[in-house]
Amino acid sequence: MDKQYKVGVVGATGMVGQRFVTLLENHPWFKLTTLAASGRSAGKTYEEAVGSRWAMTTPMPESVKKMVVLDASKVEEVASQVDFIFCAVNMPKDEIKALEEAYAKAECPVVSNNSANRFTPDVPMVVPEINADHIDIIPAQRKRLGTKRGFIAVTRYFRRPKQGMALTA
């Protein structure tokens, strides 16, 4: 793959967000350009926002330490900087659904690690090795949301691709 997609992590300071950050470091398909979290973390560098709560077994990547964390509720600002987001927020399910739909309606695709949309009929839960065809429901979701590009897809986990594995859609 020649192009790297610009991606953001929404909920970047929490445990799952930290995991996304470590997995996206030096990823062949994705360039982590944007980190977003709650208003408490907004405006701080990632290193300041996470502080001693860094929970990963590997050190915080140098490439993100000085990145300024954006306010995840400022959807248009975050969405304008990325091709899509990975969502790992920790909030009540109704708030997660509203936030993820706001990003999708801002024409920003959402790959969610949250359970809030797992039973929404037109939101695919995709485990690529098992059910990649579930993305076929996305046009129906786009119609419901009134979007051309934005959508929500839920995944149960995120890992680096095996060497030589091709990205398919």
Predicted regions and their residues:
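N-terminal Rossmann-like NAD(P) cofactor-binding subdomain of oxidoreductases
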Residues: M1-A169
